[in-house]
């Protein structure tokens, strides 16, 4: 039986997160297509920051979108790696039931927070797919048979 947390954070319901974020150039992740409010880079930056704010309890992690597009492709690759490592950390966190029961604020457990991150990630990954479609970069080459 598939682990629920692994399913939520890494593999479930749409292409693997690494595949979904693969094959993009610096130019593509920096584009803000007409009618869109953010670039792919900004969407992932926000999702990674929110994820980190919950996993690491770092309240400042996801406060503001970056003011400029990344200048170097390595910034994009680093952000993807940070996001994927954060998702792995969420899965690891969830493997201990006693940790899930920790109350992080009155009436809110760590399990509640992790569910929130999973839903938040799904929302922003969906926006990234929509942006990729708008700029002609979907499906990723790694998942061309899974649209």
Regions found by a protein language model. Give the residues of each.
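Short, contiguous alpha-helical
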Residues: 2, 6-21, 26-68, 105-147
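Acidic/histidine-rich alpha-helical segments that form the ligand environment
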Residues: 71-105, 112-119
